[in-house]
């Protein structure tokens, strides 16, 4: 049973939190008003052909399991909770089209990369971008004339738009559950070449980039990776390591972060098959199935290989 003093403290904490949220919101509104001319310039540039100097993705999309890593259609939801229980994410598939796949996210990576390039030139990250199927496929290293690739873009956009999310990943207030999708999209396809595609980012992605420096550079080779789990690891491990020389994680948690649906034994076997840009070592543990460490070459701990 809580005491009057504890109730008073809780009330003060809630008032303080609400004041901080209000001040942050007012600051964003003032910033938006000041940046109005840049916004219009950025939105216009985002409709034109822009050469990419680097490829990018949003930090949370790299850290958490936002998509399926399997080639097959996935209907089963992803339910992830952080080790401390403070952050959680549920990913829900559309029954007809299935869950967004990690390869579909290449379309989103391209769109974020283009928006990031616009921000680099103008100083403002646009909330939407436009491009052609040819522009997107060429940037992703795929044959831009291929009918199957153009079909993939249309199917991928549908999965990206219809995959639903709920959780508290993007917000500081962990008590609030948000329900959202990552993008809205439309396209024009009168010639069969997808001459115009428009993607509007969810406000959570936009705010992460504008206010939290959430847009990170990624290696272009990631876009060419065909193995779903390896593709996931190339982003997850790099962002988790940060500037450190290694990253250690429980193998069960890593399996959850990779949205792997098989057994733990199978997941560990698959990990050992990949040629990764880090030294990978496994250590045994009594309760959680053991740990796996990814380390820069020459810095791996001794353990079970």
Predicted stretch roles:
Residues 1-305:
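Charged, alpha-helix-forming regions
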């Amino acid at each position: 049973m809580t005491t009057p003093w504890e109730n008073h403290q809780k009330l003060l904490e809630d008032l303080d939190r609400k004041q901080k949220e209000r001040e942050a919101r007012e600051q964003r509104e003032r910033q938006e008003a000041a940046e109005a001319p840049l916004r219009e310039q950025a939105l216009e540039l985002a409709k034109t052909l822009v050469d990419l100097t680097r490829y990018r993705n949003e930090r949370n999309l790299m850290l958490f399991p936002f998509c399926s890593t399997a080639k097959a259609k996935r209907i089963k939801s992803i339910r992830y909770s952080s080790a401390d229980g403070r952050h959680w994410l549920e990913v829900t598939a559309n029954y007809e089209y299935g869950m967004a796949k990690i390869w579909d996210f290449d379309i989103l990576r391209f769109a974020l990369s283009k928006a990031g390039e616009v921000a680099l030139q103008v100083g403002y990250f646009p909330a939407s971008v436009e491009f052609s199927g040819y522009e997107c496929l060429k940037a992703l290293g795929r044959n831009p004339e291929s009918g199957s690739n153009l079909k993939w873009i249309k199917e991928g956009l549908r999965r990206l738009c219809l995959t639903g999310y709920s959780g508290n990943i993007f917000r500081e207030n962990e008590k609030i559950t948000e329900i959202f999708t990552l993008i809205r999209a439309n396209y024009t396809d009168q010639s069969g070449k997808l001459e115009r595609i428009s993607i509007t980012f969810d406000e959570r992605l936009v705010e992460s980039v504008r206010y939290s420096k959430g847009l990170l550079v990624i290696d272009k080779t990631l876009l060419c990776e065909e193995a779903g789990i390896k593709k996931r690891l190339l982003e997850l491990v790099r962002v988790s390591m940060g500037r450190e020389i290694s990253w250690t994680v429980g193998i069960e948690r890593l399996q959850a972060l990779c949205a792997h649906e098989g057994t733990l034994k199978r997941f560990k076997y698959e990990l050992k098959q990949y040629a990764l840009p880090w030294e990978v070592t496994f250590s045994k543990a009594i309760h959680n199935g053991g740990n796996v460490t990814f380390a820069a070459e020459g810095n791996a701990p001794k353990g079970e290989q």
